[in-house]
Design a protein with these regions (language model features):
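Short linear sequence motifs
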Residues: 20, 109-112, 182
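Alpha-helix termini
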Residues: 47, 54, 58, 125, ...
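Glycine-rich beta-alpha junction loops
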Residues: 75, 122, 160
């Protein structure tokens, strides 16, 4: 259940079509249905977010008490709204600092979550990293396998990407990986469902 942020104005700016209330409702529903290992992803460095916005988000997550939190540093992808419509966002502040990351780490520690994985990728805000935190026994094994590209992913829906990883190693120790992307346009996806 990935809010990205708990600031509604930011969700609106970045084109996310869920609300903070829907995130909270979804989390509570999942808990009531017996889900006992819920991960929540946040993104640091989103437009117009400052340290107080990060604090607000972490306080709301602390109330929900997830089992696992991943703190991502903003990395603007080629097809992301922030890149495609960059002229709209040029004047907006997008900052991720060590202070933001430290604040998140402090809140995670207060919630009994410890870091269990870290990874970096190209173009991350503030030259920071992504860090996964988890309660004892609640680490997101999926997250680690995905970062190490050791897990096959079967994806459904417009714009999704399936990735097949062969478990037999190549002579050089690497693994064969094949990707298959579904068309992004929902109408085309529906019309071509048998091809996907």
């Amino acid at each position: 259940i990935n809010p990205q942020t708990m600031k509604q104005e930011t969700l609106d700016i970045i084109g996310r079509h869920h609300t903070v209330d829907q995130t909270i409702e979804s989390f509570k529903l999942a808990r009531s249905l017996g889900f006992d290992n819920i991960n929540m992803d946040l993104i640091m460095g989103l437009p117009e977010e400052d340290i107080e916005d990060v604090r607000h988000t972490m306080e709301l997550l602390q109330e929900l008490d997830p089992d696992n939190i991943t703190i991502h540093s903003l990395a603007i992808k080629r097809a992301a709204r922030l890149n495609i419509f960059k002229d709209r966002y040029e004047s907006m502040q997008m900052v991720n600092t060590q202070e933001h990351m430290d604040l998140c780490a402090d809140y995670c520690a207060q919630m009994g979550l410890s870091p269990y994985y870290l990874y970096r990728q190209k173009g991350m805000a503030g030259n920071m990293e992504n860090v996964g935190y988890a309660k004892p026994g609640k680490a997101g094994v999926y997250n680690v396998l995905i970062m190490e590209e050791r897990q096959t992913i079967i994806a459904c829906g417009a714009g999704s990407s399936t990735k097949r990883v062969w478990q037999e190693a190549n002579p050089d120790g690497t693994h064969r990986i094949e990707r298959c992307e579904n068309v992004k346009d929902v109408g085309q996806y529906i019309d071509r469902i048998d091809e996907m």
